[in-house]
């Protein structure tokens, strides 16, 4: 058993007041306007970017057609005055009035992906927003290579940038912001690592073991329930989903005790989802290695809460199972008893995530949290409704809106969705308390949210994030997002926890 890689293996992030002798490339920002591009920020780093250097750079950039459009990349030879620097990379930031933290994060990510084979980079982007720039550089440089042999391992000129130095105007500028940004980026990368690890190597017992290693190293309380403990405890949802696999399920609980206010995090941890007896189409089934992205996010967030010493208590309850078809698998038409006693008729074994989440939500409710957030790659309907980059956020109205707002502020773009009362009757069963799916395709994301609501304790502020599309990028890289696991919604979750802690 090997723990998830130490994310300190990402690029080193540092602050500097001067260009060092080892700097290979200087990264600057360009904004666009009708009058041509401008270097941003325009009021800092005059000792490095003197008026003459700025003029020379703008002449060179203009000569090769640089416009400053968002995420545009233009590389030119460094002016002689920038001693030791071989080239300058100008990354587009777009129009100044539209430049925000997320655009800067994306532009920094694009720059980082273009700097493979570079050892040391300096940048002025931190003068705009050092936290956003740092997150963008770190996450844009992310790679996942544990399963590459010497035959396909990255060559020196293919390796991500090793060190990013942020030019700062004073010695203490951005110190705390950079510290937090690196911790956040490392947490996102940890979630990505979990998601990108193939199911041959990340199955429930292994997922639980890796989580335990990380949690104990962070000083968290850890509880792991194996299949026998799950049976004894009556966790019918987790057991039902996992019974078709030769690799039995687990339920992991992590607790960071930082203060009296309690927040429960729940994450769907289906390490591979074939659909079970209601089997999925073979095409693209390999992407179901990502069906534990919700679990990865809440684990990484709980570890991050501890690293940031937030003054609240955060408990993650993470059910882990593999959904496989076999002679022992649950069948369409079976009835199972969830933790807490609710009976559910399983009409579709591919609607399994809600079954394991229901057990976890009831268990988490026994801790009397004030807030409860569950995260899951729950429905294909999320992508039909909102696309692949916009999480659906459901829950109690006030908290749902709060989580969605914060998600938009951090650039993960959660969107508030309703839980229409008229859809609830579609989850009635003729023989049990509930059916796990509605008898039609309409509003599938919302029906799943309504199902989960049945298990949320009364009076708890609750949010449900469906990240089926946003948690895993099957297309080409964009911004600071590469192919595979994205780490969404770690940045949303930690920002929500910080917001709760600040109340």
UniProtKB/Swiss-Prot annotation:
<comment type="similarity">
    <text>Belongs to the peptidase M17 family.</text>
</comment>
<feature type="binding site">
    <location>
        <position position="268"/>
    </location>
    <ligand>
        <name>Mn(2+) 2</name>
    </ligand>
</feature>
<feature type="active site">
    <location>
        <position position="280"/>
    </location>
</feature>
<feature type="active site">
    <location>
        <position position="354"/>
    </location>
</feature>
<dbReference type="Pfam" id="PF00883">
    <property type="entry name" value="Peptidase_M17"/>
</dbReference>
<dbReference type="GO" id="GO:0005737">
    <property type="term" value="C:cytoplasm"/>
</dbReference>
<feature type="binding site">
    <location>
        <position position="273"/>
    </location>
    <ligand>
        <name>Mn(2+) 1</name>
    </ligand>
</feature>
<keyword id="KW-0645">Protease</keyword>
<dbReference type="InterPro" id="IPR011356">
    <property type="entry name" value="Leucine_aapep/pepB"/>
</dbReference>
<dbReference type="InterPro" id="IPR023042">
    <property type="entry name" value="Peptidase_M17_leu_NH2_pept"/>
</dbReference>
<feature type="binding site">
    <location>
        <position position="352"/>
    </location>
    <ligand>
        <name>Mn(2+) 2</name>
    </ligand>
</feature>
<dbReference type="InterPro" id="IPR008283">
    <property type="entry name" value="Peptidase_M17_N"/>
</dbReference>
<feature type="binding site">
    <location>
        <position position="273"/>
    </location>
    <ligand>
        <name>Mn(2+) 2</name>
    </ligand>
</feature>
<dbReference type="GO" id="GO:0030145">
    <property type="term" value="F:manganese ion binding"/>
</dbReference>
<feature type="binding site">
    <location>
        <position position="352"/>
    </location>
    <ligand>
        <name>Mn(2+) 1</name>
    </ligand>
</feature>
<dbReference type="Pfam" id="PF02789">
    <property type="entry name" value="Peptidase_M17_N"/>
</dbReference>
<keyword id="KW-0963">Cytoplasm</keyword>
<dbReference type="GO" id="GO:0070006">
    <property type="term" value="F:metalloaminopeptidase activity"/>
</dbReference>
<protein>
    <recommendedName>
        <fullName>Probable cytosol aminopeptidase</fullName>
        <ecNumber>3.4.11.1</ecNumber>
        <ecNumber>3.4.11.10</ecNumber>
    </recommendedName>
</protein>
<feature type="binding site">
    <location>
        <position position="291"/>
    </location>
    <ligand>
        <name>Mn(2+) 2</name>
    </ligand>
</feature>
<feature type="binding site">
    <location>
        <position position="350"/>
    </location>
    <ligand>
        <name>Mn(2+) 1</name>
    </ligand>
</feature>
<keyword id="KW-0378">Hydrolase</keyword>
<dbReference type="InterPro" id="IPR043472">
    <property type="entry name" value="Macro_dom-like"/>
</dbReference>
<keyword id="KW-0031">Aminopeptidase</keyword>
<dbReference type="InterPro" id="IPR000819">
    <property type="entry name" value="Peptidase_M17_C"/>
</dbReference>
<keyword id="KW-0479">Metal-binding</keyword>
<keyword id="KW-0464">Manganese</keyword>
<comment type="function">
    <text>Presumably involved in the processing and regular turnover of intracellular proteins. Catalyzes the removal of unsubstituted N-terminal amino acids from various peptides.</text>
</comment>
<dbReference type="GO" id="GO:0006508">
    <property type="term" value="P:proteolysis"/>
</dbReference>
